[in-house]
Amino acid sequence: MSEQSRCPVTGRTADSPATGSGLSNRDWWPNQLHLDMLHQHSSLVNPMGEGFRYKEEFGKLDLKEVKKDLYALMTDSQEWWPADYGHYGGLFIRMAWHSAGTYRTSDGRGGGGTGNQRFAPLNSWPDNANLDKARRLLWPIKQKYGKKISWADLMILAGNCALESMGFKTFGFGGGRVDIWEPEEDIYWGKEVEWLGNKRYSGERDLENPLAAVQMGLIYVNPEGPDGKPDPVAAGRDIRETFARMAMNDEETVALVAGGHTFGKCHGVGDPKLVGPEPEAADIEEQGLGWKSGYGIGKGDETMTSGLEGAWTPDPIHWDMGYLGMLFRYEWELTKSPAGAWQWKPKDVAEEDLAPAAHDPSKRVPTMMTTADLAMRMDPIYGPISQRYYEHPDQFADAFARAWFKLTHRDMGPHSRYLGAEVPAEELIWQDPVPALDHDLIDAEEIAELKKRLLASGLSIPELVSTAWASASTFRGSDKRGGANGARIRLAPQKDWEVNQPEQLQRVLHKLEEIRNTFNGEQSGNKQVSLADMIVLGGCAAVEEAAGKAGTGVTVPFTPGRTDALQEQTDTESFSVLEPLADGFRNYMKKKYSVSAEEMLVDRSQLLTLTAPEMTVLLGGLRVLGANFQQSPHGVFTTQPETLTNDYFVNLLDMGTEWKPLSKEQDTFEGRDRKTGEPRWTATRVDLIFGSNSRLRAIAEVYGSDDAQEKFVHDFVAAWDKVMNLDRFDLG
């Protein structure tokens, strides 16, 4: 081969594969534990730098000016992608809705909080067709305000401004969404390998957890009906399941569908085969835009998007009762769009109920409804709600405003995280409110005194540790729910969860309450300590005591300031999704699952925002502290229980132990002395993965070394402190 064909630096030829190409480890070993999800979104991929503080930058933003620019954009139709009816409102509502609408309650993942619609796979989902144009239309505004407003905030704000510019009064807007710079590794979107696949169902029509959408690449349901079959009643069942998994009840669902479909139109005037590839598959010269259509001019009245065609209302750019009016005033007959999609047309429609053509106001065209829309009338539950909204427009407007606000803010956590002048004063129950701090905080001397009382109370180290862990470890970094603040572990439903060992929990809480009441009664002035703080402080005191027993003196950080929520501030149904199906840190599995215990451990660790080293040191420490569910001996690799030693790692890595499964499911194991055959330990998959997985074993070796005891304790304390404070947004 000629030297001209070789790279002068690497010596590679023109036929050599690119660096980083070829099979990955996961290609070779598909069942390999997916630890990469614990190390996402690092400073290495973030161009903003480690010192960037979005909250500070957003505080410099003139929100009124941004909104003024967004209002102007709504009617500034661009030749490269002209606005339907001269107004981009419908497009931006869809963009904001589809940004927020990926949220699901089961794991809190998805939603509009990260700006992930910019990246694959979402930027190329079939349901997001042509939303790439919406984001490009926003670019001049993003460019103008730069780091002061994130893409995530701008997309939601654009949806609000679209509604307001068409005459609707929104409930408010809270900023504070921080952009990510790479696609998430932790979100499971489904097992399908083709767009619109639906292998997510089993049985009659049981949708796989944690999924909410009915098909791969859809945000909600198939608008043509289940699996494309135009059955409005069956569609209603799909809609109810899907919206419930996205935190919406029946009234909110009707309000969102009817309110959102008051605006804009669907696009399906030609052959869908003429539509080009999605953004991630498009040619480089398309510069990140996809779905280039070969039908006509490919835009305007010849746009292809969903395959459905037409507006829902006669006036698609103004807030009115047009959607519900059309839904109830007409009978509907099944038809197909020009693109071949099932939809419905009104029978004997009056002239005044025709809509203008989107790009030629001199023409009048029929409106349409999708099968999903007709479910709002024909479903036995949705129908009466729709009728009530139709008869009470003010009630409908309020319901839509509140449901839209919930849709676009559900994944942001508590009210205290919202930024900006348009944050509503009203706290809503789905924001998991906690009372405002109304007392003076305990100081270092009083903290030390309370620790003494806790350790002298008769409560054991395992009881104090496991109670604090149970309270704090409900936190989910995905939607910022859960955590120790509020002491909701004493309320329904958490007090009754099996994993929390209710009988033991009540005994521990009673003793903590007793110590708290005695202390508070001794105070003069306004100084108090909350039960939420007592729960965490008890765990901290126990960790300190256990470290001292191991000969490693340490002070576990503790910051008071938590308050105690009331039962009426706690939506029991909403909180039920926080119940752990498995908690590897306590060696707990509610039942057998198709997903392995070690995978569930990594998933839980990711929700707790833990890295692999933090996960490792926490689990090893909690084992020797005796925090296992029902005091199980599995994984307690120590002869000095309740002592914070690195024994877990020393004994796990001991080649003198040979492990054998105790069950055909290979979920529990026994370790015997390799020479004598004498039993030494028992363990679960969650324990043995730290010796089996090469990456986790490498970390375990750090903590199992002869010189590692002090590092182990300090790393455990740091990780413990992190978990105890995950929901302390007041600490910055």
UniProtKB/Swiss-Prot annotation:
One of its GO terms (biological process) is cellular response to hydrogen peroxide. Homodimer or homotetramer. InterPro entries: Catalase_peroxidase, Haem_peroxidase, Haem_peroxidase_sf, Peroxidases_AS, Peroxidases_heam-ligand_BS. Residues 1-23 are annotated as: Disordered. The keyword Aminoacyl-tRNA synthetase does not apply. GO terms for cellular component: cytosol. Its EC number is 1.11.1.21. Formation of the three residue Trp-Tyr-Met cross-link is important for the catalase, but not the peroxidase activity of the enzyme. There is a cross-link at residues 220-246 (Tryptophyl-tyrosyl-methioninium (Tyr-Met) (with W-97)). The active site is at 98 (proton acceptor). Belongs to the peroxidase family. Peroxidase/catalase subfamily. Binds 1 heme b (iron(II)-protoporphyrin IX) group per dimer. Keywords: Heme, Hydrogen peroxide, Iron, Metal-binding, Oxidoreductase, Peroxidase. Bifunctional enzyme with both catalase and broad-spectrum peroxidase activity. This is Catalase-peroxidase. The keyword Iron applies. The record marks 94 as: Transition state stabilizer. Heme b binds at residue 261. There is a cross-link at residues 97-220 (Tryptophyl-tyrosyl-methioninium (Trp-Tyr) (with M-246)). It catalyses: H2O2 + AH2 = A + 2 H2O; 2 H2O2 = O2 + 2 H2O. It comes from the Bacteria. SUPFAM superfamilies: Heme-dependent peroxidases.
